[in-house]
A protein has these predicted regions:
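Non-catalytic membrane-proximal stalk/linker segments that position and tether the catalytic domains
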Residues: 1-64, 111
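N-terminal strand-loop element at the rim of the active site
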Residues: 4-21, 73-74, 92-130
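A short, active-site helix/loop in glycosyltransferases that binds the activated sugar's phosphate group
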Residues: 17-28, 205-223
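Active-site proximal beta-strand in glycosyltransferases
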Residues: 66, 167-185
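A short, glycine/small-residue-rich beta-strand->loop->alpha-helix junction that serves as a flexible
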Residues: 69-82
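Histidine-centered beta-alpha loop that forms part of the nucleotide-sugar donor binding/catalytic region
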Residues: 70, 124, 155-156, 178-184
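Short N-terminal targeting/anchoring amphipathic segment
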Residues: 140-160
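Membrane-proximal helix-turn-helix segments that form the acceptor-binding/catalytic region
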Residues: 191-210
């Protein structure tokens, strides 16, 4: 028997890890309808919410930075990211970082990440069919739940779209936006180029800081 589709509910920002644990169980035996849904993660009693598995996989309640990247393999972009992460580890070892990878389940360079970085492959935790809406909801909840104030997009198209579709949310919750758009990579089309460059300042015009080049962003973190 196929599980019914899950409807995502707004997540209260003060939800406890104990409640996340409770909602992580795979099956429930009760059919009681819940009326007070403020802290309920999912409607259907058969399916746990994808977000719950991700949140419980992170060992800390609070993080400083979330980095989003499409893939994490062994290419030039991945090498650049590793260098930045190692530099941050050396200069600001107390910063806690979530590296969120959209595609794949593991990578050959996973073991090279500094201790300050917790790695999440989205596909290892998402049982639902992937959609931009689902990604937006997961990213919003991670930011609120873990009190993240720095969003660093490392050449990830889905995060460009997130900044456009959830502009009000990120103005309210994110203090620093960092964009890495590797100069040797070309966007797939003009729309992506616009999201990466031309439209970005309009999306984040109310941010505390607007940082769109690599060196300035690193200098900000180090100071």
């Amino acid at each position: 028997q196929k599980n019914k589709k899950t409807t995502l509910l707004p997540l209260h920002e003060n939800i406890s890890r104990d409640l996340l644990d409770l909602n992580a169980i795979e099956y429930r035996i009760t059919s009681t309808k819940v009326e007070n849904t403020e802290n309920v993660i999912f409607h259907n009693k058969l399916i746990p919410n994808d977000y719950v598995r991700i949140a419980l996989a992170l060992p800390y309640d609070g993080y400083d930075i979330i980095i989003t990247i499409k893939t994490f393999r062994t290419g030039g972009t991945d090498k650049l990211l590793l260098r930045y992460l190692k530099g941050i580890q050396q200069s600001q070892p107390e910063l806690r970082i979530v590296l969120l990878v959209l595609e794949g389940h593991h990578g050959d360079w996973d073991y090279l990440l500094p201790d300050s970085v917790d790695l999440i492959y989205l596909k290892n935790y998402c049982y639902q069919t992937y959609s931009q809406q689902l990604y937006n909801q997961i990213l919003e909840r991670l930011i609120v739940q873990h009190h993240i104030k720095i969003l660093w997009n490392f050449n990830c198209r889905e995060t460009y779209i997130f900044t456009e579709q959830c502009a009000d949310f990120i103005r309210e919750n994110i203090e620093v936006w960092g964009l890495i758009f590797a100069h040797w990579l070309r966007p797939n089309n003009l729309q992506e180029f616009g999201m990466a460059h031309e439209n970005l300042p309009f999306v984040i015009q109310d941010y505390t800081k607007i940082i769109s080049d690599n060196q300035t962003f690193i200098n900000y973190l180090c100071n």
